Structures are given as structure tokens and as C-alpha cells.
A protein has these predicted regions:
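Amphipathic, small/basic residue-rich leader segments at the start of a protein or domain
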Residues: 1-107, 124-128, 132-135, 139, ...
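A short core secondary-structure module
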Residues: 167, 171-192
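Short, solvent-exposed loop/turn elements at beta->coil junctions and helix N-caps
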Residues: 77, 145-149, 176
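Short acidic, glycine/serine/threonine-rich loops at helix termini
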Residues: 117-118, 152-156, 180-183, 187
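N-terminal glycine-rich flavin-associated loop
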Residues: 103-124, 150-153, 164
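A structural signal for short hydrophobic beta-strand segments in well-ordered beta-sheet cores
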Residues: 158-161
């Protein structure tokens, strides 16, 4: 069942002493159970082979999108699940048990790309891009690391300048971009 805005509402325990810190609401408990079943049935059987062959399972990733897992914190109007940070931690934990590489791809996509776009993107970018990344049609990434600066974002040397025709000229180099070359043909990802 894909996660949507119609997923049952959060019900908090009457006393904080009764709270299950790993599943603070019924919604979180349902999410954990759904992801745990998915990991057992789909992720675990392919994990070792994908890791040995250094292969990204795009079909499995897209299945995560159809389940509502690739835009957990994105608003429902853009195809996201509209959930919270605890939900992200639950999916992260369950995926990492069987396939840390897939988990890293999920986090790079869902948190570094989708979450940043939700909070920093223009309305037109959100409308154009979020539905495709939340569904898994597109795989998101973030080019942060640079040869001379590592991950020091305040020291970034790459620049982007808009041309008179509206296109962008990007100068600089990026490296170690998780999900950076994942598309149907294995070609480099487009820049936003």
C-alpha cells in the first residue's frame, strides 16, 4: 500500500511513559512493518549479488517509489508521503539491515535531494521535479564534494551563472556523487 495523505492519522499515547520510542505512533509502527516485509521479501534476496556486482537495482528502487518511500517528507501535493523525520529513520534502519548500499542510495535521494528541493526549490522546480523523484521515475542526487574542498560546502569553488538565453553555465568539478550516474542508460544525471 503506497503511503499517502490518507494514511491513518497519528495517535500519541496518553503518557510519555507508554510511548514506544522506536514507533511513537501507529503510523510509524505500520511503516516499519511494511518496510520490514519489503526488505525481507525483495531487498534481502538481491542484496549480496547487487553488492558483489556493484550494480544498482533500479527496478527495486522504483518499487520503493510506488510504495511511497522515495518522498517521505515531501508534501502529498507533489507526490510525497508528508511524513516526518522519524519515518525517514525507520526506513533507513530497516533498509540498512540487509542492503547498506541501497540504504545509502535511498538517503541520498530522499534526504539530500528530495528534502533539499522541498525546502529550497522554487515552486516551478517542485512542480516539475518532485512528482518524478517521489515516484522513482527519476533518481535524485546532490553534487557536494569537490577535489579541493571535500565536503566543505562553505569552501565550494563550483559556480553557476545564468546566460542571457536563460540556460546555466556551470564551472567546477564534483566527485563522489552517490546516485550521480543512475538513469535508464547509465549516463550522467542532469543538473537541476
Amino acid at each position: 500500500m503506497p503511503l499517502t495523505a490518507t494514511t491513518p492519522t497519528r495517535v500519541m499515547p496518553e503518557s510519555w511513559r507508554d510511548m514506544d520510542i522506536a514507533n511513537p505512533t501507529e503510523e510509524h509502527s505500520m511503516l516499519r512493518e511494511m518496510v520490514r516485509d519489503f526488505v525481507r521479501e525483495k531487498v534481502e534476496p538481491q542484496a549480496l549479488e547487487s553488492d558483489r556486482n556493484e550494480r544498482f537495482n533500479l527496478g527495486l528502487f522504483r518499487e520503493m517509489g510506488s510504495m511511497g518511500l522515495l518522498g517521505l517528507t515531501a508534501p502529498p501535493e507533489y507526490g510525497g508521503a508528508g511524513m516526518d523525520a522519524t519515518s525517514v529513520a525507520i526506513v533507513n534502519e530497516e533498509l540498512s539491515y540487509s542492503d547498506p548500499g541501497l540504504c545509502l542510495a535511498f538517503l541520498a535521494h530522499d534526504q539530500l535531494f528530495v528534502n533539499n528541493l522541498v525546502h529550497s526549490g522554487s515552486d516551478s522546480q517542485k512542480e516539475r521535479i518532485l512528482p518524478k523523484v517521489c515516484s522513482g521515475e527519476w533518481v535524485g542526487c546532490l553534487g557536494m564534494s569537490e577535489p579541493n574542498q571535500g565536503t566543505d560546502v562553505l569552501g565550494m569553488e563550483t559556480s553557476a551563472k545564468q546566460s542571457d538565453d536563460g540556460s546555466w553555465i556551470i564551472n567546477g568539478r564534483k566527485m563522489w556523487i552517490t546516485n550521480g550516474i543512475i538513469d535508464d542508460e547509465g549516463t550522467p544525471a542532469d543538473l537541476v
